[in-house]
Regions:
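Membrane-interface interhelical linkers
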Residues: 1-19, 49-74, 123, 184-211, ...
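Cytoplasmic-side transmembrane-helix entry/capping segments in multi-pass membrane proteins
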Residues: 11-14, 66-77, 121-133, 149-154, ...
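Hydrophobic alpha-helical transmembrane segments of multi-pass membrane transport proteins
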Residues: 16-23, 27, 73-91, 154-165, ...
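Transmembrane alpha-helical segments that form core, pore/gating elements
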Residues: 26-29, 37-38, 52, 144-201, ...
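C-terminal-most transmembrane helix of multi-pass membrane proteins
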Residues: 142, 244-287
Length: 287
């Protein structure tokens, strides 16, 4: 009988999460800047709280409790900053180019995981992420650099911090509780920022925001599960799988066909991911 190791399970959870995150990016792209980033974030987080609340209420009193409030507040505002940067980047860049910068997050996760978690990544992990970073540079092509890439880098940084900090969450705080508190604690600041930029929205825009909220909620949940099962340095490269998804979605939905240079950069970004499945799979034979 074949059984996946905890690292392999975490890897697949993260790949599935990146599929949902990629679809969430498509929802933002379809909005095409018609809704301000602050308004988008506030409505998305409000919907997230409404969806999670019934599930949170079913949790036991122990798992519902807010633990490590400072850490949860920190993570909630990472979501705000990263989401705002993401909306700007996706609106002004192609899906593939914006996400190529987003997926610099695993490169940032290596030093962060070393500093915050005391993890010791292998030489192959370091070389793999450096190879991925070379791919990012090829996709961006400094001669054609877009100012929105700075916002994409902001998203990558907050994503790296968000994922690594999940390892410090108390075990007594369930995934549902973590998602609930992260969404709820982000609302006050998001609401204040939204007041300055509020404008009427139609049903179509609200539907896209709601879909994006649900999809990113699934990603956050899967990411929490994944990074609790394995060290960030061991599975962070799986974040690159989302770049494959957004490239395909960009071609399908928006006719954003990458040229050969961009395609080469994307291949360099995802190449380090290819051997992970084989390396982390365990075969256990039960008599």
């Amino acid at each position: 009988m074949t059984r996946l190791s905890p690292q392999a399970i975490a890897l697949w959870l993260l790949i599935a999460g990146n599929l949902t995150a990629s679809l969430s990016d498509v929802m933002v792209k379809l909005l095409d800047g018609s809704v301000s980033p602050f308004q988008y974030i506030f409505i998305r987080q409000l919907i997230s709280v409404a969806v999670i609340y019934p599930l949170w209420r079913k949790e036991t009193r122990v798992t519902r409790q807010l633990r490590s409030p400072g850490l949860n507040v920190f993570r909630a505002h990472l979501v705000l900053i990263g989401s705002g940067c993401m909306v700007v980047a996706i609106t002004h860049m192609t899906l593939a180019s914006a996400n190529a910068v987003f997926y610099a997050a695993p490169l940032l996760m290596l030093p962060i995981s070393v500093l915050l978690m005391g993890e010791k990544p292998s030489r192959s992990k370091v070389l793999g992420t450096l190879l991925g970073f070379v791919g990012v540079l090829i996709v961006l092509r400094p001669s054609q650099f877009h100012w929105a890439a700075f916002f994409a880098l902001g998203t990558a940084t907050t994503l790296a911090l968000f994922n690594v900090s999940a390892r410090k969450l108390p075990e007594q705080q369930s995934m549902i509780s973590t998602l609930f508190w992260t969404s709820l604690l982000s609302l006050p600041v998001a609401g204040i920022l939204t007041v300055w930029s509020w404008q009427p929205i139609n049903a179509s825009q609200l539907g896209l925001i709601a879909a994006g909220a649900l999809l990113i909620l699934v990603y956050n949940g899967l990411a929490v599960l994944a990074y609790r099962k394995a060290p960030a340095g061991e599975i962070g490269l799986a974040e690159y799988s989302g770049l494959v998804f957004v490239t395909l979605f960009g071609i399908w939905w928006f006719n954003e066909i990458p040229d050969w240079i961009t395609a080469m950069g994307i291949m360099l970004i995802i190449a380090p991911l290819l051997p992970i499945r084989r390396r982390f799979r365990q075969r256990i034979v039960n008599s």
